[in-house]
């Protein structure tokens, strides 16, 4: 399989997305113009190819840079209201607005440089034979 799999799990709009550099991601509408850059700092998990870092709840210092590629509308979702025996019915439709992001870099920000915890020294009970 060869290549290094660098990816991150980010949060945007209350939803979580697994992103890799160069990927196009559709997130809920953001108030940004096409071509604007954004830094997503809610990184929940980070895999840099060697180590996996899991945040609690987020990883401090880790960021994902992205550029707005455009805005689109999703597929139309229909809701239908119907009342029996009264000829009362209503069909409603909704199209969700999305922002398309092009993922740039995944910056660790020193997230993988956490020092390992040292094991605790075990206490030993010494027994003396001199009666003290």
UniProtKB/Swiss-Prot annotation:
InterPro entries: bL21-like (IPR028909), bL21-like_sf (IPR036164), Ribosomal_bL21 (IPR001787), Ribosomal_bL21_CS (IPR018258). GO terms for molecular function: rRNA binding; structural constituent of ribosome. The keyword Cell wall biogenesis/degradation does not apply. The keyword Mitochondrion does not apply. Keywords: Ribonucleoprotein, Ribosomal protein, RNA-binding, rRNA-binding. Residues 111-132 are annotated as: Disordered. One of its GO terms (cellular component) is cytoplasm. GO terms for biological process: translation. This protein binds to 23S rRNA in the presence of protein L20. Belongs to the bacterial ribosomal protein bL21 family. Part of the 50S ribosomal subunit. Contacts protein L20. This is Large ribosomal subunit protein bL21.
